[in-house]
Amino acid sequence: MRWMVGLSCLAACLSAAVPANCQEMRDGEALLTAMHDRYKDSWYESVVFKENAITLNPDGTSKTEVWDEALELPGKLRINRGPSSEGNGFVFADGTLTTFQKGKATGPRPYVHMLLVLGFDVYRQNPETTIDQAKGQGFDLTQIHEEKWEGQDVYVVGAAKGDLKSKQFWIEKKRLLFVRLIAQDEHDATKIHDTRFRDYRRLSTGWISARVEFYTNGKNTFNEDYFDMKANAKFDPALFDPTRFNETRIDSDAKQ
């Protein structure tokens, strides 16, 4: 009976553990808040992992490097591209980005890493901070609708239905996990970048996307495949200090 189904859903939505799919997301602010509230007491504080970084060239060839990454949430990410001895990588910290090439630094410059924000930080920082970051990066949080994405229901924030050019992010409805970001290139509006978080796996009491795919104008140009993932690793604070990049190393055997 329809009325019985309705009462069942009402009862579920009034229970202590209210599932997101029983809530009507009125806008992006409500969604970002729900993401935080779902995992605020369980999401890991840090993670260390290795990745196969795969560049897909226009001629059909590819190049693979092994990178080391360390995240401390919210807002800190250290990447070593290749062996630490080569001095190549990035440090994202305190809203800035410093790039290293053969040990020489460029930056820091202001930078909000929205993949870090939406894939990780959102669960470990105040919702108001995430909302301010998203607005500051040009996402229209008043725009929200639902889509089907690879067989799953998703929320799309920042664009109207059918618009795949405006800046937008996609969130899986069931688990409230980030799955896609679409945005124009900062320097060339004819290029549309599309980043996809795939292959979510349990990590401690949270989740991590073990594969990240990058597309430009529909063509897959770069992929990241994560392995040796460890949650709640303990890091030396100097690891995220750009001035000490060349004297610190990411320890894949960091204590948990």
What is each of the regions a protein language model found here?
Residues M1-M4:
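Positively charged n-region of N-terminal signal peptides that target proteins for export
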Residues G6-A16:
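Bacterial N-terminal signal peptides
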Residues V18-C22:
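Sec/Tat signal peptide C-region and signal peptidase I cleavage site
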Residues Q23-T33, W43, T96-K165, D185-K191, ...:
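Flexible, processing/modification-adjacent segments and terminal tails
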Residues D27-A105, D140-T142:
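N-terminal mature ectodomain segment of secretory-pathway/periplasmic proteins
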Residues V48-I54, N80, T98, E146, ...:
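Residue-level detector of beta-strand face positions
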Residues E69-L73, A93-T96, V112-L116, E172-K174, ...:
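A short, sequence-level motif marking secondary-structure junctions
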Residues P83-E86, E150-N246:
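Gly/Pro-enriched, hydrophobic low-complexity segments
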